Amino acid sequence: MIQMQTELQVADNSGAKRVECIKVLGGSHRRYASVGDVIKVTVKEAAPRGKAKKGSVYNAVVVRTAKGVRRKDGSKVRFDDNAAVLLNNNGQPIGTRIFGPVTRELRTEKFMKIVSLAPEVL
């Protein structure tokens, strides 16, 4: 469950290390985002020679949450951290690698690239 001012780890090699959610996209008063939702983030910490610079604003898709995702069979998938993947204006990932597992809920037409780059899909 991600809301405004939540800090997330970045699960790609775009150069950003840590980002902060500044808006949950999709609806005028939407409060929370979960896995697969797109949020607006600002970069709080970045690698020296990465594509993403500190202070820049991007769209990102949430790939892991500590709150977890409930499946239709009653099981729940939780993670140790909250993580996101930065997106460009076309909705494609900025990085060329994804670190850590992602959930099967990302397997939609928009985010198949992220699922194919991920080392593990839960």
Swiss-Prot record:
Please list the GO biological process terms of this entry: translation
Q: Note the PROSITE patterns from the entry.
A: RIBOSOMAL_L14
Q: Any keyword RNA-binding?
A: yes
Q: Which CDD domains match?
A: Ribosomal_uL14
What pairs make up the disulfide bonds?
Answer: none
Tell me which UniProt keywords the record has, alphabetically.
Ribonucleoprotein, Ribosomal protein, RNA-binding, rRNA-binding
Could you tell me which Pfam families the record lists for this protein? Ribosomal_L14
The answer to keyword Ribonucleoprotein applying to this record is yes
Q: Which PANTHER family match?
A: 50S/60S RIBOSOMAL PROTEIN L14/L23, LARGE RIBOSOMAL SUBUNIT PROTEIN UL14M
Q: Per the similarity annotation, which family is this?
A: Belongs to the universal ribosomal protein uL14 family.
Q: What does this protein do?
A: Binds to 23S rRNA. Forms part of two intersubunit bridges in the 70S ribosome.
Q: How does it assemble?
A: Part of the 50S ribosomal subunit. Forms a cluster with proteins L3 and L19. In the 70S ribosome, L14 and L19 interact and together make contacts with the 16S rRNA in bridges B5 and B8.
Q: Indicate what this protein is called per its UniProt record.
A: Large ribosomal subunit protein uL14
- Specify the taxonomic lineage: Bacteria, Pseudomonadati, Pseudomonadota, Gammaproteobacteria, Thiotrichales
